[in-house]
Amino acid sequence: MKLSMKLKLITTDYQNQVLLDTMQRFNSACDYISDIAYNNKVFGQVNLHHLTYYDIRDKFGLGAQMTVRAIGKVVESYKIEKKYKHTFKPFGAIVYDSRILKFKFPDKISISMLEGRQVIPFIFKNYRDIDIRRASGQADLVYHDGIFYLVVCVDLPEPPQDDTKEFLGVDMGIVN
């Protein structure tokens, strides 16, 4: 069973500013990629990658994997609707994967930004008995009301199924 968990990042003023700059630059790159995709009617990951990768690296100064994630974000948005050019909010979410985000258990992450990697502490409300070490796959960096959150997917084991040996049948009558 998979659950989403929201981790609150405890950033310094410097980290906060660099994350904001990273978000703006990432989403500006997405707008640029979207413009090329729409004008050339190229919406597939591989073809769009060949058209834009080196351009994005040079113009926006994003790292290799951040550039790939930006292209992926645009490709995903065009899977839904291809008739209109898509735009991205300056502080829209960034999708991180295991190459640009690492957990430093029990309470820190190492996250890639424009200025390199930073180690940032996090906190979360443990409503259930969830082991954060089970976080897997991608995570979304979200900015809301001046606070950064990381939304991660946690893979939980399936609860055991009860083996029922007896049962009771109830006659509900005949329905015509």
Model region roles, listed by residue range:
Residues 1-176:
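Nucleic-acid substrate recognition interfaces
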